[in-house]
Amino acid sequence: MTKKMGLLVMAYGTPYKESDIEPYYTDIRHGKRPSEEELQDLKDRYEFIGGLSPLAGTTDDQADALVSALNKAYADVEFKLYLGLKHISPFIEDAVEQMHNDGITEAITVVLAPHYSSFSVGSYDKRADEEAAKYGIQLTHVKHYYEQPKFIEYWTNKVNETLAQIPEEEHKDTVLVVSAHSLPKGLIEKNNDPYPQELEHTALLIKEQSNIEHIAIGWQSEGNTGTPWLGPDVQDLTRDLYEKHQYKNFIYTPVGFVCEHLEVLYDNDYECKVVCDDIGANYYRPKMPNTHPLFIGAIVDEIKSIF
């Protein structure tokens, strides 16, 4: 007999339409409304990348691809998909309540972020656990999946494909910048989070398996809290690497993200490219995983290792 289980896919969320931007931003800021200037800045960024972020559609596609792959991988389990978002509807709590209404008593949870930190993945899991406890739903959490061979294979392939576009004699003048979303330094230290080490490990695995010679680790998209965040920032890092090594080609792999969205399309494709243009270097940024079978397969393999 087939066992019915929930698959709770959790993600950050993004505004669906312009009128969502203010409540979305207010939720990110724990209920504190943004100033007109801050709101306009965010609207300008969305406008710059061609309108609202494609994240919402991509998140849906990733969740659909994952539940489909899982149902093929497990002959004796039927997974039903639930989407829970951090900062916009359907919220994580709504998804767990819907599970209960559908009679689901057990579920696997996955956050669309490959590295673990208590600030990101841990906070999603906590919200899901608190809601699930009301209904007696048992949750099994995927903590991370950056070590999965298919995840590393995806990025290794992308790095090698990008290198193939660069003349071989310039490979020695090419650097790979591996990055993830910066987080408050104090929180990482206080919780002894493995987050920075997990990014370093990702970079090492990519370097070992790809043809890249030079590699550097950076952080991006830090918040404006007035407290120190993990660094160096990718823009500062780019200038620093150029000053020290005169690299001609910069390849950016924001491996902490899983699709094209504001942080990649603006913070990398605009802000980092501006720096590259300024120093006279070439900017490269391979395609993000989105629904690539290797990426979806990496999450399936991680689930198989814990369930």
UniProtKB/Swiss-Prot annotation:
InterPro entries: Ferrochelatase, Ferrochelatase_AS, Ferrochelatase_C, Ferrochelatase_N. It is an enzyme of class 4 (lyase). It catalyses: Fe-coproporphyrin III + 2 H(+) = coproporphyrin III + Fe(2+). It comes from the Bacteria. Pathway: Porphyrin-containing compound metabolism; protoheme biosynthesis. GO terms for cellular component: cytoplasm. It is found in: Cytoplasm. Involved in coproporphyrin-dependent heme b biosynthesis. Catalyzes the insertion of ferrous iron into coproporphyrin III to form Fe-coproporphyrin III. This is Coproporphyrin III ferrochelatase.
